[in-house]
Amino acid sequence: EKVFNKVIAFSDAEINKFSTASLITRSTNDVQQIQMVTVMMLRMVLYAPILSIGGIVKVVGNGAGMGWVIFIGIAAVVILMGTLMVIAMPKFKVMQTLVDRVNLVSREILTGIPVIRAFGREEREEERFDEANKDLTKNTLFVNRVMTFAMPILMFIMYAISILIEWVAAHKIDAGVLQVGSMTAFITYTMLIIMSFLMLSMMSVMLPRASVAADRIQEIIDTDVTVQDAAGAKKLETPRGVVKYDNVAFAYPGADENVLENISFEAKPGQTTAIIGSTGCGKSTLVQLLPRFYDVTEGSITIDGQDIRDLTMESVRQNIGFVPQKGILFSGTIASNIRFGAPDASDEDVKLAAEIAQASDFIEEKEHGYDSAVAQGGGNVSGGQKQRLAIARAIARKPKILIFDDSFSALDFKTDVAVRKALGEHVNDSTVFIVAQRVSTILSADQILVLDEGTIVGKGTHKELMQTCEEYRQIAESQLSPSEIAASLGTDSERQV
């Protein structure tokens, strides 16, 4: 639970550092390794010392004078297990890394099956998985062979000690200084002692892998979360939703150059701020700074004049409705997905959110309507339907700030227009951000920011930018026909969102 809670608290920077596949392995397989060893320790660690101590007491009391034989046996067991641990420990470390690799490849293949099939790369991906699996199998077989080799040696030591005792005892019996009964008792007690050390040695076989797993888990626990509440952070109370970026710059952790530079603008309630630009110019990064998926490197972002770093993340995010580029759904029902950010939303609120997102038609066509099941990852709905449900989920929260991170890309033009029109009618007091690739999506925005290589090169309405910003004009002319451009310039004042 502690590991999972820490992972949930990670920002995107920490998640990218470990990778999703590695975090899954560490949160499941590594934890299971420690659980298994803990159970074994509870069973053996108490039982084995009792056997060994009891056996030693009896051997000393027996007076057979063969205690040195026992020490030879114990020394042999300790040397053997120490040698095996030295050989196996590095392989255990490699094994967990290879488990990460197999999980990563499996996850990539399973999520990318449509692309793999479309490009006819099934055979290559099978080879890639086979390669990762063979590496893991090879490493696992080596470790298992080493550990399998240990048991015959341990049994050999136990029987060799028994034979040695009988040989020494035979001479003592022949000399008349030892009774047969004492020899039998001594052998029994010696076997108890050796058996207890065998049990402990079996624990030592499991400890290396558990130790590696513990180190990997501890690495997660010891990792500092870069985005967290400051000491004395305040709650964002009854916000109006005025958002201001003041000379913001941002660089990804470990990067040499800023992704964003000198970003300054203000977004007000009831208005739509659109962001457009070429691929990779920092559009999504800009809006992801607002809910603090990352923290700014320089400058500040404020809501109603309060720096978001001085506010609790929970209170900031509770007032934001975020729709990512790729719609993400969870297993459950359509209603539970729409209520994801607003568990107390009424049935009417859920239906209204679906209507605004233009999702109500396909929902009501289903046999069970809003109670229809949603498969893991939304596998039983189309891309457009998934995106509309994601939009409905954000709207149902009734946030003061709405962020659409290229969320209309999966919608056809007609649905795009209908969604924006409904938003203008029902969500007219929120501060709206729209990241877009299509100029047609943002024609009616109150403010358009044009990004180029991480800086704002244009700011204004569509009509203003067509006159003042060369980059925006090139984008518009590449997407719209002359007649569409003329129509858009003539109707700039008729805004929907």
PLM segments and residue spans:
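Hydrophobic, well-ordered secondary-structure segments
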Residues: 1-22, 42-85, 106, 110, ...
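Helix-loop junctions and hydrophobic alpha-helical segments within the transmembrane domains
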Residues: 3, 7, 116, 129, ...
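An intracellular "coupling" helix at the cytosolic face of ABC transporter transmembrane type-1 domains
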Residues: 9-15, 29-38, 42, 46, ...
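Helix-loop-helix
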Residues: 54-79, 85-86, 142-216, 220-221
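Pre-NBD coupling/linker segments of ABC/ABC-like ATPases
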Residues: 226-238
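ABC-type nucleotide-binding domain
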Residues: 236-497
